[in-house]
Amino acid sequence: MRLVLLGPPGSGKGTQATRLKDTFDIPHISTGDLLRAEVAAGSPLGLKAKEVMARGDLVSDDILLGMLEARLGQADVAKGFILDGYPRNVAQANALDELLGKIGQPLDAVVQLDVASELLVERIAGRAKAEGREDDNPESVRKRLQVYTDSTAPVIGFYEQRGKLARVDGVGSLDEVLERISKALGR
């Protein structure tokens, strides 16, 4: 099973990716985690990324794709993976499709977790309070949701046109959402 998990901030992508990893016994690949690991390891890509981030800029698609290509070349992804945090725009979706085609591992499915904006704001505000994260205030959350709508939401259409997209209601208990995802994947 080769799967991309999409959804706005606070939709439960990371939580469900971890649960799916255990359910399907395939690795959960988070581009954020990959980036942090490469920087910590001091790899050539990590050093480039560190320099970019130190300037306050976004890490380029080329750097992210290079990290992803290296990760997808590892043995544990032979039977599949769950990708979270990538692609974030249509250019990245095209690059991912090209990369996966090159290595003979095309995506099986893309799951979009749907959650209403106001509930997302509530969820993230609750998480911020529990974790003491000051950057998760309602205004910054709304801005992040707008960035998602502007950049990442078009990726939904990209995969919908290719017949890969499954939309799943992301509201409910963790088990209910996992069950909906599994059902959407035909499992």
Swiss-Prot record:
Xref: CDD domains: ADK
Domain of life according to the entry: Bacteria
Assembly and binders: Monomer.
NMP as annotated region, ranges: 30-59
Binding site for AMP: 31, 36, 57-59, 85-88, 92, 133, 144
Known EC number: 2.7.4.3
SS bonds (residue pairs): none
GO molecular function, one term: adenylate kinase activity
Catalysed reaction, written as an equation: AMP + ATP = 2 ADP
Compartments where located: Cytoplasm
Record's keyword terms, sorted: ATP-binding, Cytoplasm, Kinase, Nucleotide biosynthesis, Nucleotide-binding, Transferase
Free-text note regarding domains: Consists of three domains, a large central CORE domain and two small peripheral domains, NMPbind and LID, which undergo movements during catalysis. The LID domain closes over the site of phosphoryl transfer upon ATP binding. Assembling and dissambling the active center during each catalytic cycle provides an effective means to prevent ATP hydrolysis.
Class of the enzyme per the UniProt entry, highest EC level: transferase
Described function: Catalyzes the reversible transfer of the terminal phosphate group between ATP and AMP. Plays an important role in cellular energy homeostasis and in adenine nucleotide metabolism.
Spans annotated as LID: 126-136
Name recorded for this polypeptide: Adenylate kinase
Family from the record: Belongs to the adenylate kinase family.
One Gene Ontology term from the biological process aspect of the record: AMP salvage
Biological pathway: Purine metabolism; AMP biosynthesis via salvage pathway; AMP from ADP: step 1/1
Cellular compartments per GO CC: cytoplasm
Binding site for ATP: 10-15, 127, 172
Pfam families according to UniProt: ADK (PF00406)
